[in-house]
Amino acid sequence: MTDKTYKIAVLPGDGIGPEVMAQAHKVLDAIEKKHAIHFEREEHDVGGIAIDNHGCPLPQSTVTACEESDAVLFGSVGGPKWEHLPPNDQPERGALLPLRKHFQLFCNLRPAQIHSGLEAFSPLRADISGRGFDIVVVRELTGGIYFGQPKGREGEGANEKAYDTEIYHRFEIERIAKIAFESARLRRKKVCSIDKANVLQSSILWREVVEELAKDYPDVELSHMYIDNATMQLIKDPAQFDVMLCSNIFGDIISDECAMITGSMGMLPSASLNESKFGLYEPAGGSAPDIAGKNIANPVAQILSAALMLRYSLGEEAAAQDIENAVSQALAAGELTADLAGDKPALSTAEMGDKIAQYILNS
């Protein structure tokens, strides 16, 4: 049987990006050995290193490589070296936002969970974190109040005013809700849709459309929750949630809250998808230039981003689960990088990558 081949554009970027990406490569190598899969991988410049080498944060050659690939595995961009540049020329705004726009990445997926043995890092009370949680926030990324028109400021003195417009079209709600329901089918089959339908017209439409779409997913349990209650319930009982479906602004709030209650940002991957399931996969954290090159960064978020890539863009669920299980095994065995080890001996970035790859091969 011939191996399935996937073409991956690998964009390590700046700061800790290259060293954590090297660990994702090790894990993908292990997946190739275990499964009938081959990854054709090419690395390309993005962010600050692209400014240094090409004069701009997102060279056309990088965009072309992404267009010719099945998915993009992204590291991190930015650092003090480029902060003097105009905002639109800086690595973050000049690379990530144009990539999202170019590929019409309307859906952001942010998993958040407490891994066994890491409960103490959560700011939640021990009896709450001890129950564990495993949530995926499905956030609409291109609509809503951040992009709705009109927006602006006018007037002066006491009559000066500013305004933004929350707009959602039926098709925007349908396509993001579809991803939430399909994600739930791969998990515990529960979707909680977050809105403010007691006040906002956009939320009333949101709820109506989600209810209609739910009829196509009779195996998935749908519930609704107002955003203000949802932020409280995440603190009180996060274990009740499986997939949380959110508009742009509500998802912005909820995904950051979910990240914080895990207590370990270095562990959190994210995915941004378009309608054809093409995606950009990246750690939720930043480029951490203060620890770059020291071989101490936690590579788990980058490795789990590769697992999301396998699941959502490539449809390789078994391989994705192998990576996630290997990460869980390493953490449960107390194999931790410096950000989590505390007083115990810490693994280096490279050692953590080696451990996780070995767990995959041994499974």
Curated annotation (Swiss-Prot):
In terms of Gene3D superfamilies, this protein maps to: Isopropylmalate Dehydrogenase
Q: Alphabetically, which GO biological process terms does the record hold?
A: L-leucine biosynthetic process
Site (Important for catalysis): which residue positions?
Answer: 146, 196
| CC annotations in GO | cytosol
Q: Which UniProt keywords apply?
A: Amino-acid biosynthesis, Branched-chain amino acid biosynthesis, Cytoplasm, Leucine biosynthesis, Magnesium, Manganese, Metal-binding, NAD, Oxidoreductase
- Annotated residues for binding of Mg(2+): 228, 252, 256
Keyword Metal-binding included in the entry's annotation: yes
Q: Which InterPro entries match?
A: IsoCit/isopropylmalate_DH_CS, IsoPropMal-DH-like_dom, Isopropylmalate_DH
**Name of the molecule in the record:** 3-isopropylmalate dehydrogenase
Organism encoding this protein: Vibrio vulnificus (strain CMCP6)
Gene from which the chain derives = leuB
